[in-house]
Design a protein with these regions (language model features):
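Terminal amphipathic alpha-helical/low-complexity segments used for targeting or macromolecular assembly
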Residues: 31, 37, 42-58, 64, ...
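Structural signal for interior beta-strand "rungs" in well-ordered beta-sheet cores
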Residues: 1-168
Length: 263
């Protein structure tokens, strides 16, 4: 340990841990367990930090987290008052996982061995990344998303979905929704919305409008609509046949939608 490191009550460091609070402060919440050879708080993989002595807003880790061997969590790329790299509560980072600078990781997130999240990305609550899954920088991954092993995304993934190919949504995470206690009626409405609006290319404005209308009677559908409306990178498309050969760039009119943006 070096520099400004604050450990909450009951934190366990199991030996050969490397925690650097000299680049920026590191705060680790109560009852978190850090396994051997995990590295936390070192400078980001950014050329501007090489030999310059720049300071960072650091790292904040929540309570009851498990950080396994060789996991890495890098400090933010900007100093305070910019936010630190942030890990929520009850996050499980398995062996050799990576959280890059300026990421915001929600609660109850799981990264399986070898998964990596690039800088400035956001993972909302209850996201699971399979082994060796990778997230491009600045991406947003919605609540209760599950990514299969060896997948990669460079576009945003709406809440409640499953990713089973590169930048492709295979369907809803129905098993996760049931385990999370979502009522059957809401799951049914989500499935209808996904089937009707996300499987094939459709104008972004129409998707948001129709999904918002359906969301009046189903909050999870409304949550998905808000996520899509806020997207700046574009949305991973579904597995509909109409997607073959299509380009997923967002235009000015359809910014934030990985679908056709013209009527």
């Amino acid at each position: 340990l070096k520099g400004k490191v604050k450990l909450g009550a009951g934190v366990k460091l199991l030996g050969n841990n490397y925690i650097a609070g000299d680049v920026g402060p590191v705060v680790i919440g109560a009852r978190t367990i850090v396994y051997p050879f995990a590295c936390i708080g070192y400078e980001p993989q950014d050329f501007k930090f090489i030999g310059t002595g720049l300071k960072s807003a650091g790292v904040v880790i929540g309570t009851d987290c498990l950080i396994r061997e060789h996991a890495t969590i890098h400090a933010a790329s900007h100093d305070a008052p910019s936010p630190p790299t942030t890990i929520g509560n009850k996050v499980f980072l398995m062996v050799s996982t990576h959280i890059a600078h300026d990421c915001l990781i929600g609660n109850n997130v799981v990264l399986v061995n070898g998964a990596g999240v690039a800088g400035h990305s956001v993972l909302e609550d209850n996201v699971t990344l399979g082994g060796n899954a990778v997230i491009h920088q600045f991406c947003r991954i919605g609540r209760m998303v599950m990514m299969s092993g060896d997948c990669a995304v460079s576009l945003d993934v709406p809440p409640f979905c499953m990713v089973n190919e590169r930048n492709r949504i295979g369907g809803l995470n129905t098993v996760g929704l049931r385990r999370g206690g979502m009522p059957r009626e809401q799951i049914t409405e989500l499935r209808r919305a996904f089937r009707d609006l996300l499987r094939d290319p459709m104008p972004r404005a129409r998707v948001i409008s129709e999904m918002t209308e359906r969301g009046r009677s189903c909050e999870p559908v409304a949550e998905m609509a808000r996520f899509i409306a806020a997207s700046k990178r574009g949305i991973c498309p579904g597995m509909g046949k109409g997607l073959r050969g299509s380009r997923m760039n967002a235009s000015k009119d359809g910014e934030g939608m990985g679908m056709d943006s013209e009527d």
